[in-house]
Amino acid sequence: MAKTTKGKTPRRARRNISAGRAYVHASYNNTIVTITDLDGNSVAWSSGGTIGYKGSKKGTPYAAQLAAADAVKKAQQAFGMNVVDVIVRGTGSGREQAIRAIQASGIEVKSIMDDSPVPHNGCRPKKKFRA
């Protein structure tokens, strides 16, 4: 029986995405940074866990700083992104550091928007979140 040779499939050409959005989801346990294009398609992401931290260290500001820098680096190297709008969700301790890390990583920050979910008096909060 003759061998069938599989030809190499051509590699996808690098899409050049100059502008996008950086979503920072800052919870008390972790900070997740997702870089998307303007249509909302995910381009790169990173979190406190992917950096290498486990447990409560994932929620620290330093882990958020490293995660934001890592996500921006991935987006710049793979797609040449140089302008982002930052959208922040949540009240975790890493939100400020993540924004600072994005600004310091050499990418232009056009705007910063807080899109944290606020209930219109929905479910009763847990004991530690009640005043």
Curated annotation (Swiss-Prot):
Located on the platform of the 30S subunit, it bridges several disparate RNA helices of the 16S rRNA. Forms part of the Shine-Dalgarno cleft in the 70S ribosome. GO terms for cellular component: ribonucleoprotein complex; ribosome. Belongs to the universal ribosomal protein uS11 family. GO terms for biological process: translation. Transmembrane segments: none annotated. It comes from the Bacteria. The gene is rpsK. HAMAP family: Ribosomal_uS11. GO terms for molecular function: rRNA binding; structural constituent of ribosome. Part of the 30S ribosomal subunit. Interacts with proteins S7 and S18. Binds to IF-3. Keywords: Ribonucleoprotein, Ribosomal protein, RNA-binding, rRNA-binding. InterPro entries: Ribosomal_uS11, Ribosomal_uS11_bac-type, Ribosomal_uS11_CS, Ribosomal_uS11_sf. It holds the Pfam family Ribosomal_S11. This is Small ribosomal subunit protein uS11.
